[in-house]
């Protein structure tokens, strides 16, 4: 509740970082395919049906799905160990959210984090290596459609999936830039017989988000 108030994020679900696959499997229904995706090098957030309704009412209000993910950097494993030492008990699940105010771009510079996140975070952990580009976590959803086999749908292509190219059925004579819409924005560059999708940018309703949108286009082109 405190985190939602500080981030101005009243209703959107949070993701859960699970210590390992066994912990994630205790929380949500995971098929073999979903487990493979969770453990792949893309390490996405997987939206899956919760095994116990209302287990985390503050995390996923209004939905019966939970977004679970596994650690994708060594520091996240160390954070689990550090939390365990502080609380003197095993910590298997952490609530995850991005470093930003709702509807603003992700913060990836140390100086910006100090300026804008100091009133939200109790502590800031950073590295002396500069982060060049911010990128959201990718989100996949596990769905069972009637009697068919389970399908994994990409809800947000970002970390781990971009800037990989996608094939086109034919080549284009002239390269083109597709800039998308104002909401849930993503841009794409079309060249030859390939399309290069940017990572998820988000809504462009905030001035900072629009400037970030322009920076992504410049990087892509």
For each feature predicted by the language model, list its residue ranges.
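Active-site-adjacent structural elements in enzyme catalytic cores
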Residues: 1-221
């Amino acid at each position: 509740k405190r985190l939602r108030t500080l981030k101005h994020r009243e209703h959107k679900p949070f993701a859960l970082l699970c210590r390992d696959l066994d912990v994630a499997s205790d929380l949500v229904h995971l098929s073999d395919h979903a487990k493979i995706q969770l453990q792949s090098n893309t390490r996405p957030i997987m939206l899956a049906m919760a095994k116990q309704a209302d287990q985390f009412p503050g995390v996923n209000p209004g939905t019966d799905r939970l977004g679970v993910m596994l650690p994708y950097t060594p520091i996240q494993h160390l954070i689990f160990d550090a939390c365990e030492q502080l609380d003197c008990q095993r910590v298997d699940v952490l609530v995850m959210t991005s470093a930003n105010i709702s509807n603003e771009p992700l913060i990836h510079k140390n100086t910006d984090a100090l300026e804008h996140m100091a009133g939200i975070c109790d502590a800031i952990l950073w590295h002396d290596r500069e982060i060049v580009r911010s990128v959201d976590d990718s989100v996949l959803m596990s769905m069972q459609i009637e009697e068919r086999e389970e399908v994994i749908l990409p809800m947000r292509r970002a970390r781990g999936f971009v800037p990989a190219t996608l094939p086109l059925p034919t080549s284009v004579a002239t390269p083109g830039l597709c800039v998308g819409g104002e909401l849930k924005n993503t841009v794409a560059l079309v060249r030859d017989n390939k399309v290069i999708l940017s990572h998820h940018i988000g809504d462009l309703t905030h001035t900072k988000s629009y400037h970030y949108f322009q920076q992504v286009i410049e990087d892509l082109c």
